[in-house]
Amino acid sequence: MIIVIMGVSGSGKTVVGSQLAKKLGWNFYDADDYHPLENKEKMSQGTPLNDQDRHPWLCELHEIMMREKALGQHVVLACSALKRAYRSTLLTGSTPHWPENYQENDDLSSDTLFVHLHGSLEILSRRLLERKGHFMPRTLLDSQIDTLEPPSAPERFIAIDVDKDISVIVSEIEGEVDRKMMLVKSAQKD
């Protein structure tokens, strides 16, 4: 199973994702670690990334998830995944195709749960202002909010408000993962 912890900057993707992975004993990847230097420089200068900037990065993340799946590993990935097209690329490794050609069995679609962390502008802004040493400045939060396409059917997702303790958020996700894993095991028995 693959869990993608998604949301705008400041939503807590890395903290939640790393704690969840540790609690579950799964591998953790932070998508920020895979941005090319050009992307990091662009963002640190306050310039939002465009679709062309993101596509190779998303394809690399897809390859990582495919490799882990082939090895039989479960993965938690912290990744903004702001647009439906970006999430499609994460799942298929190809040019976005949702909804026209959506296929339930596309590469990672049936194995992936998106966890959308969301919160008020006030909470997100405060978190970004408190964060030190990150290439993503507070000034880009508005552009990320404008870009965000919250997940919806047929995507597999849950949405969690981040205005609570991290341990509560992690427990909520863990409960959902347990339910999904039980459903998979039940389906395999049938």
UniProtKB/Swiss-Prot annotation:
Q: Where does ATP bind?
A: G7, V8, S9, G10, S11, G12, K13, T14
Top class in the EC scheme = transferase
- Tell me what reaction this enzyme catalyses: D-gluconate + ATP = 6-phospho-D-gluconate + ADP + H(+)
Which Gene3D superfamilies does the record match to this protein? Answer: P-loop containing nucleotide triphosphate hydrolases
Q: In which pathway does it act?
A: Carbohydrate acid metabolism; D-gluconate degradation
Q: Name one GO biological process term.
A: carbohydrate metabolic process
Q: Which GO terms describe its molecular function?
A: ATP binding; gluconokinase activity
* Entry EC number(s): 2.7.1.12
Where are the coiled-coil regions?
none
Signal sequence bounds: none
Q: What InterPro entries does this protein map onto?
A: P-loop_NTPase, Shikimate/glucono_kinase, Therm_gnt_kin
The protein in question is named: Probable gluconokinase
Q: Which gene encodes it?
A: idnk
